[in-house]
């Protein structure tokens, strides 16, 4: 599991992990699920923010009865009872809700043993790339075949939204996009590195100037968004989320630095002032940061940075 250091507060570090959903999956395995207990209908709790968004996007929101404290979208999800966070679960809250299914980043997550003891089926939703999100949606379709009408309608809306990615002027607030088309578009829109602006995406950093930072390398969802938006990752050839000291950051000499800052605390405006000639922007919401159904909105946000839009 990808965990970023607690530099300023446990809340900030945990939120970055939740917002980015950098949950390592079991090597060589896609989404999977285990035998479910019988019941009158699914009662789902989700500990994975991107998983929660996908559940609602597929029309399964009425089955979701609880969430982690980081599952804050859509608004209907934010109104649900909190049953834990990324690493722990509230046994009393779970017992009261009687869930039949639990969405976790991986089947051996810290909460899994308690959930199994309560008779809950574990649904693993890997969330590191756009393809992972599509695979998770397919898993949900297999688990809940009785709700295929909702799934079919959602996929129709996905297809319409994904087609609008090529026409930003017609982009609309996310109505779930067809992730299969989105994955294909992420692959086909990669631009030549010779002409693309070189970008460093920082996902967590120490407070103040000259602090160390973690940034998104190749093979990450943020790297996919960069390439799809016609940008080049300054960490080409580096996998995952490496730790970078100030000297390494300066040596990379990116044209643009994107500081993802999804929590409520104000960003440190002085953090990157030591980088000469580098345009730095801050993205403060989670829409562009979670591998999930808001993929079209995320891609438009990154394309806006190509046009010189300010982060927000």
Residue ranges of predicted features:
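A short, structured surface patch at a secondary-structure boundary
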Residues: 42-114, 231-237, 270
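Bacterial N-terminal signal peptides that target proteins for export
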Residues: 3-19
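Proline-aspartate-enriched helix->loop->beta-strand connector
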Residues: 88-104, 245-262
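Short secondary-structure boundary segments
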Residues: 48, 106, 203-205, 238-241, ...
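Extracytoplasmic substrate-binding proteins
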Residues: 33-43, 110-210, 232-236, 244, ...
């Amino acid at each position: 599991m990808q965990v970023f250091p607690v530099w300023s507060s446990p809340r900030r570090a945990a939120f970055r992990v939740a917002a980015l959903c950098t949950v390592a999956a079991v090597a060589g395995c896609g989404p999977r699920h285990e035998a479910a207990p019988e019941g009158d209908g699914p009662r789902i709790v989700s500990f994975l923010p991107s998983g929660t968004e996908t559940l609602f996007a597929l029309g399964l929101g009425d089955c979701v009865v609880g969430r982690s404290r980081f599952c804050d979208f859509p608004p209907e999800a934010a109104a649900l009872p909190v049953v834990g966070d990324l690493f722990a679960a509230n046994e009393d809250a779970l017992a009261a809700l009687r869930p039949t299914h639990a969405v976790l980043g991986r089947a051996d997550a810290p909460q899994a043993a308690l959930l199994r003891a309560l008779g809950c089926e574990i649904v693993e939703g890997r969330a590191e790339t756009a393809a992972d999100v599509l695979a998770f949606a397919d898993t949900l379709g297999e688990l809940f075949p009785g709700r295929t009408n909702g799934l079919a309608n959602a996929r129709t809306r996905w297809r319409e939204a994904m087609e609008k990615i090529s026409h930003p002027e017609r982009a609309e607030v996310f109505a779930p996009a067809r992730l299969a088309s989105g994955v294909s578009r992420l692959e086909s829109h990669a631009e030549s590195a010779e002409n693309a602006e070189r970008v460093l995406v920082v996902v967590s950093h120490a407070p103040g100037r000259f602090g160390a930072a973690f940034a998104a390398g190749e093979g990450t969802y943020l790297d996919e968004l960069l390439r799809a938006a016609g940008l080049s990752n300054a960490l080409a050839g580096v996998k995952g989320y490496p730790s970078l000291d100030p000297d390494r950051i300066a040596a990379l000499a990116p044209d643009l630095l994107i500081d993802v800052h999804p929590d409520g605390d104000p960003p440190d405006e002085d953090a990157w002032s030591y980088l000469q000639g580098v345009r730095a922007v801050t993205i403060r919401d989670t829409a562009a940061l979670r591998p999930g159904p808001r993929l079209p909105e995320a891609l438009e946000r990154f394309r806006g940075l190509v046009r010189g839009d300010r982060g927000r």
